[in-house]
A protein has these predicted regions:
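Short linear interaction motif-like sites in intrinsically disordered regions of transcription factors
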Residues: 29, 67-68, 170
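N-terminal functional modules and adjacent low-complexity/disordered segments of proteins
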Residues: 24, 51-53, 84-87, 125-127, ...
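Intrinsically disordered, low-complexity, charged/polar segments
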Residues: 91-198
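Short, low-complexity intrinsically disordered segments
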Residues: 26, 64-65, 167
Length: 198
């Protein structure tokens, strides 16, 4: 069992079930986001840093028929056109989210542990990014048929952006912040499969 899944199990046991743990995680996030001195969830107005998880509001993009107004994004390297790019974790089933973050944690465990000590403990902005690229993410998600979850985000359409510390990946996995417009995850996945089979 991976580290993120272990932490989710511990949070679920402490809360008296996974549903209660999810409610507690969402309450923790909203409280932390508003707290001025809180660093585990920290305001971040700049571009994405790879390997970090961001939550933000996203306005209707002109070029997209469907979009998520409240993405939870595991950041990748910047797109060639200059947009931020990442995996919208809201689009993934819980098991796939857990598998993905466990996979990344296992790959970078020593590095992440180094970023969660001393002054960097629970300090999302101070923690250094990971070298996690589009190529690696795409290979992983293709195994599940969910590489459509890799999205681009224009800086001008993002607002209220915060970054979450590595120590709290398990909590953010439990949160359900999806606000999908003009479609459903099932419809998007079906359309994506149809596109791949052309």
């Amino acid at each position: 069992m991976g580290e993120v899944r272990k932490q989710i199990r511990a949070l679920s046991k402490e809360a008296g079930g996974k549903a209660r743990a999810a409610s507690a995680a969402e309450e923790w996030f909203q409280t932390s986001k508003k707290a001025v001195r809180e660093k585990a969830v920290s305001r971040s107005a700049g571009p994405f840093e790879p390997g970090k998880i961001y939550v933000f509001r996203y306005e209707n993009p002109i070029s997209a028929f469907w979009w998520d107004s409240n993405p939870v994004v595991l950041a990748l390297n910047k797109a060639d056109n200059g947009n931020d790019m990442g995996i919208n974790l809201n689009m993934l089933p819980v098991k796939v989210k857990e598998d993905l973050l466990d996979f990344i944690y296992d790959q970078y465990q020593g590095y992440i542990n180094g970023q969660t000590r001393g002054a960097k403990t629970e300090n999302a902005r101070a923690q250094a990014p990971l070298q996690f690229s589009y190529q690696g993410a795409s290979r992983f998600l293709k195994r599940y048929g969910f590489d459509f979850a890799i999205r681009q985000y224009a800086m001008t359409r993002k607002s209220q952006q915060v970054v979450v510390s590595y120590e709290n990946w398990a909590r953010i996995v439990l949160c359900d912040f999806l606000e999908l417009n003009n479609s459903s995850v099932g419809q998007i996945r079906a359309a994506f499969r149809k596109h791949l089979n052309k």
